[in-house]
Amino acid sequence: MEVAGYGTHNRDLKQWMVTLLSALSLMMVVVTIGLLALFLVFDIQVNSNSGQKSSNQLKDLQETNENLVDEIFIDSALNNRYIKNHVVGLTPEEDDTKADIVMVFQPPATGRRTVGKKTHHSILDQKTRNARALPADVSLVQVKDCGKRAIPLIANRIVSGNPAAKGAWPWQVSLQRSNIHQCGGTLIGNMWVVTAAHCFRTNSNPRQWTLSFGTTINPPLMKRDVRRIIMHERYRPPARDHDIALVQFSPRVTFSDEVRRICLPEPSASFPPNSTVYITGFGALYYGGESQNELREARVQIISNDICKKRHVYGNEIKRGMFCAGFLEGNYDACRGDSGGPLVIRDNKDTWYLIGIVSWGDNCGQKNKPGVYTQVTYYRHWIASKTGL
């Protein structure tokens, strides 16, 4: 392993050492909001208990910084070599907080044992220029706000395909017929879910459908009755175009840490290829398998349309309003039972947006056959026209 460090003098360490540990003294002026700024932004009053609260906030800031550095290097040119980071110290200063961080990397194949400081500084500076940290007290997040999680994302601690933590993806919904999971869906309002139209190809009778919330199907956190199903007017199976539907349910849900709506992007929003995105669902773990009782999560990447439309991938099957995400080598992918579920992305203010709806693909995790998703921005006006959202 290789460790990149800052803030200490390690010039006397010998090159043959397998692990080089040093402290990263990085002024996280933008990445870490100083305690004074935090109090102002979230209107926290400093009182006689401020010492204890400050201690708790420093602990949360430590975790926040680790998460943010994870995200930075996972999305960087060093992602294949990055292992982890750890905050070894936080020092509050006048307007910000200084973080001492140890970062661990795999050594390069060339045999060089170290990576230049300028490389890491350049990546950190570029990636954090517009970033901001999570609030130290997550209970301060307004539950009415869209796209907010009650717990922070720990990016490199997600083992793709593993069960999701409680409250991690509060907009995930299970669409069920006769109490049996059929498809996923995404909560976009207190009475609306968006999903895939093909989920209702054989049965679109609202009375035979219910919605389940929470990270387990059985027992569910709560259930709701479906009142109306709106399939896109131009959806004509077996064609895969316009694979989107809206579900209206009752009674309305009250937003909480475990049930929250996702944000919808503006129609003009764009998301570049290779962006890190996340899929969740109760679907099978392999082709031909059964749906799972526990919600599972996976981290994938957006694949450009130029690549997805290549002959050996999907060719001219990719139409307007579709895009691909996953990995060409296979690995993690949506599968049977994940249809209609969310593909989400996080912005630099830790707000989550729904950018895709699980639509179709050849088998599950097959080489050169990534998942294909309905493009939410393409149908943003349609969603607004039906729901007012």
From Swiss-Prot:
- Establish whether keyword Membrane is in the entry: yes
Regions crossing the membrane: 24-44
The active site annotation covers 198 (charge relay system), 243 (charge relay system), 339 (charge relay system)
Principal EC category: hydrolase
Under the heading CDD domains, the entry gives: Tryp_SPc (cd00190)
Using the chain's own numbering, where are the disulfide bonds? 183-199, 308-324, 335-364
Q: For this protein, what is any one GO molecular function term? A: serine-type endopeptidase activity
Q: Which residues does the UniProt record annotate as the domain SEA?
A: 31-148
Ranges per topology, Extracellular: 45-389
Give the record's GO biological process terms.
Answer: proteolysis; symbiont entry into host cell
| Cytoplasmic topological segments | 1-23
Q: What is its EC number?
A: 3.4.21.-
Q: Where located?
A: Membrane
Q: Does the keyword Transmembrane apply?
A: yes
UniProtKB keywords? Cell cycle, Disulfide bond, Glycoprotein, Hydrolase, Membrane, Protease, Serine protease, Signal-anchor, Transmembrane, Transmembrane helix
Q: How does it sit in the membrane?
A: Single-pass type II membrane protein
Family statement: Belongs to the peptidase S1 family.
Q: Which PANTHER family match?
A: ACROSIN-RELATED (PTHR24252), SUPPRESSOR OF TUMORIGENICITY 14 PROTEIN HOMOLOG-RELATED (PTHR24252:SF17)
The protein's name is Transmembrane protease serine 11A
Biological source species: Mus musculus (Mouse)
Gene name of the record: Tmprss11a
